[in-house]
Every structure is written in C-alpha cells, then in structure tokens.
Amino acid sequence: MKKRRKNTKKSLKIRVKNALKKREHIKAYRPSLPVAQSWFRTLNRGLFSGRLTEPHIHIGRLMGDWGRCCANWDNRKTRRGTYDQRVIPYGKAPIDYAIELHSKFPSWKDFIETLAHEMVHLYQMQVMEDPYSNHNENFYSFKSRFKTHGLTLYR
C-alpha cells in the first residue's frame, strides 16, 4: 500500500488562507509562544523545505520593530581582532540563533509575514551562510516563493 504525500506547497497556501479567514476580524493579534513555534514549523516545511533548525523564539515588547533575527556568538572565547564584529563568524565560533517577535501585531497576517520575514534572515544565516544576512539579493530571491503562498515579503 502506497503512502500519500501531501503537497506541502498547496497545503501551506490553503492553511494560511483558512487561518487568515478565521482571524480576519481580529484587529490586534497577540501571538503566544506555542502558536509561533507551530507556525515556524509549518512555514519551514512549506517555504524552506524543512532546512531550518528551530531557534529560540522570544515574544515581548520591541521598540521600533515587529521582529528580529539574532545571531549570538561568544566573542570572549576568541582572541580580539580574530574577526569583524559586523560579519557573522561562520566556523570560527559556535553561533546561537534566536527570533524575537513583538507581543502585539495589527493583524494575524502581519504576524505571519513578520515571522516568515525573520525566517528568511535565518535561512540566510543557517543555510546560505551570508556574512551580512541583510536585505540584499539573497533576501529578495524569496519574494516569488512568498507570493505563491499568498504572503508578501516586505523590507
């Protein structure tokens, strides 16, 4: 007996569409940690083919941002001047990744698009090993993939 594999691209688009319809009346969405982790796994399977390892996710008040993707490494264990602090030192020091999300979003779609946006930065760090992981051509290469799933990739 053959097992049927779900088409993850189609199921993600349908899941986002259904969740958006279910939550369209909510004006101020407050995400919880289990919801953020669940949607991280869903978006990881649908947008990134499951290539991301789940980082620490923090939900709290952020000044001026809806989300951040952080790469933390312990520079106390490496000699000063070993690498530029503005460039992520892949292979030189162990790196811990974290995604920080604001505790309140104007709508549910803003929450999902912010989480997916930060996941693109995480993909740049974990898979592409982009030394800057900013809004460059690697970042915008995901725009068409977002569009097929009914999401928008903002700066």
Describe the residue ranges of each PLM region:
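Active-site-proximal or metal-binding-adjacent scaffold patches in catalytic folds
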Residues: 1-113, 122-155
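Walker B catalytic acidic pair
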Residues: 118
